[in-house]
């Protein structure tokens, strides 16, 4: 694909049929000029692309003419390599820090409404604002010439979005002093508008957009529980990354992606010291980056991550992992999140009673797997028996509730010797074992459970289990959307995995690297801690 072309490319068929409507809301369109996103009230009007802000100046046009050949050659060369694989640098927010239960719970509170609004009632508390960096963040390049952006990698989000030039509230520096950058479409030679008349926008809204005018943008509005909101519009541009060229070797590549351009934010959405440039969504929806790349025939619709719970970082790969071997369980159909059925839970050698009259047949429990959540959240009917069984072998322990939410006790010995492991058994005989050193956290002078009771809210009736990084760390987790399965195996995430190149059939080693925590003027070869590698479908491009 010639990314230097300014003509509109083909629309992606059936592109966003599964996108949750709570995330993207398309207001009535008008033919007014570009909306001032700093004005009030916060009702978004259409964006008109013949507005001065989207019209290059004569100087810009001349400059673009002078660099066209150089950029065209660069993009064309890297486009061929993009069929080998994609590499994004990702790091852990909590790497190098003592595990803090309060820090983890605060992070999960900010995810509450994001999951709640998608049809899952998990009373984690908090406002639901995504104004804090997630567990793992990546560095990517966007535009031509590319600029660098730090984005949260999140399997619970369905779109990629970046703060844009119209956002006056957005911070210039974020987590650990990272230098943040506002995306400006006019600075990119390869950006394209996504209009309200596009198939993309129609599928977001479940049909044609009411009041859509020629050249008006496809808009979105995202609102949170405390009244904060984010307003923006969709664009298409080139996302640049490193591609796998051999064992532990990479080189530049790129691909075109539709993403949200955040133009206005209220409340603390744009002012948090832990903010990032945006979010890189790897959710199940057709709008996620994995679905976009797969719909264009560039990648297999499967990815894997191995999160190093001890050192931070790890591996994040798009493609067919051939080593280690991973067993799998079916994903629950028609679910907005990565969900599977837990059939049994074993604490030590004792099985818990999972029976429920409100959720599905038999004893199985719907369970969400979410790498963006830190802890694990259990229904009250599971939480209390689990905690009681864990401490049953230590009758002298005195349990205390701290800050009205943490179940804690004092203990100075080896937790792995004194307390049992907890094992979740899924369909297809897939098990997931969680050790005491995984589910117990230091908090003040106590040890506290990382298991959280999602039934503390008296209004909650959920029977859903939510498993976050607490159970996923130090495991290779494979998401296979082609076969609608998810699986995992215990693994050393500081080692390597093997990924198949679907073009040549060869197998390449992929391993973790390190990212410095601050600054932006850094070589891309030192910015990789997670590798997002795309292995491409040979029959789709041959």
Q: Residue locations for each model-derived region?
A:
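Aspartic protease catalytic domain
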Residues: 2-15, 59-95, 132, 143-145, ...
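Disordered propeptide/prodomain
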Residues: 2-26, 34-37, 43, 47-151, ...
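Conserved catalytic motifs of the protein kinase core domain
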Residues: 148, 275, 364
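Short, glycine/acidic-enriched loop or turn micro-motifs at the edges of active sites
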Residues: 157, 284, 373-375
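Eukaryotic endomembrane system proteins
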Residues: 233-246, 250-328, 332-347, 367-370
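Charged, amphipathic alpha-helical segments
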Residues: 216-223, 286-291, 401-412
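Short beta-strand-centered segments at strand-helix junctions
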Residues: 161-163, 278-289, 378-380, 466-468
């Amino acid at each position: 694909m010639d990314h230097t072309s300014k003509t509109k490319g083909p629309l992606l068929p059936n592109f966003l049929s599964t996108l949750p409507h709570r995330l993207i809301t398309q207001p009535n369109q008008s033919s007014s000029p570009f909306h001032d996103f700093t004005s009030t009230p916060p009702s978004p009007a259409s964006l008109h692309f013949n507005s001065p802000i989207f019209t290059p100046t004569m100087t810009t046009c001349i400059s673009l003419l002078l660099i066209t050949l150089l950029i065209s050659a660069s993009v064309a060369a890297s486009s061929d390599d993009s069929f080998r694989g994609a590499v994004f640098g990702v790091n852990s927010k909590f790497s190098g820090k003592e595990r803090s239960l309060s820090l983890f719970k605060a992070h999960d509170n900010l995810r509450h409404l994001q999951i709640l609004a998608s049809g899952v009632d998990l009373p984690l508390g908090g406002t639901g604002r995504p104004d804090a960096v997630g567990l793992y963040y990546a560095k990517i390049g966007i535009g031509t010439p590319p600029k660098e952006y730090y984005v949260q990698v999140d399997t619970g989000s369905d779109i990629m979005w970046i703060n844009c030039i119209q956002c006056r509230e957005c911070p210039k520096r974020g987590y650990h002093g990272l230098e943040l950058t506002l995306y400006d479409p006019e600075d990119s030679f390869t950006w394209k508008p996504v209009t309200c008349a596009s198939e993309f926008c129609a599928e977001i809204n479940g049909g044609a957009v009411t009041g859509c005018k020629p050249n008006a943008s496809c808009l979105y509005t995202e609102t949170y529980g405390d009244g904060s909101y984010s307003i923006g519009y969709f664009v298409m541009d080139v996302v640049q990354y490193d591609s796998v060229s051999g064992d532990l070797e990479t080189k530049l590549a790129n691909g075109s992606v539709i993403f949200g351009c955040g133009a206005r934010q209220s409340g603390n959405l744009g002012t948090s010291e832990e903010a990032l440039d945006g979010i890189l969504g790897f959710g199940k929806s057709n709008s996620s980056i994995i679905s976009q790349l797969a719909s264009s025939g560039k990648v297999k619709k499967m990815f894997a991550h191995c999160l190093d719970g001890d050192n931070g970082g790890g591996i994040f790969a798009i493609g067919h992992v051939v080593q280690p071997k991973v067993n799998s369980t079916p994903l629950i159909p028609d679910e907005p999140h990565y969900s599977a059925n837990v059939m049994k839970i074993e604490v030590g050698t004792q099985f818990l009673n999972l029976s429920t009259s409100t959720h599905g047949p038999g004893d199985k429990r719907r369970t969400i797997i979410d790498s963006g959540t830190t802890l694990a959240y259990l229904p009250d009917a599971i939480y209390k028996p689990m905690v009681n069984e864990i401490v049953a072998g230590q009758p002298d322990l005195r349990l205390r509730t701290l800050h009205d939410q943490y179940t804690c006790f004092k203990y100075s010995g080896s937790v792995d010797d004194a307390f049992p492991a907890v094992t979740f058994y899924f369909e297809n005989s897939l098990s997931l074992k969680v050790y005491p050193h995984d589910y117990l956290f230091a908090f003040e002078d106590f040890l506290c459970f990382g298991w959280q009771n999602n039934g503390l809210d008296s209004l909650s009736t959920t029977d859903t289990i939510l498993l976050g990084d607490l159970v996923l760390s130090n495991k290779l987790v494979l998401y296979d959307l082609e076969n609608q399965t998810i699986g995992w195996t215990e693994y050393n995430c500081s080692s390597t995995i093997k990924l198949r190149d679907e073009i040549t059939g060869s197998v390449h080693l992929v391993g973790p690297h390190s990212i410095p925590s601050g600054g932006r003027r850094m070589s891309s070869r030192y910015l990789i801690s997670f590798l997002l590698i795309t292995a491409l479908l040979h029959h789709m491009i041959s």
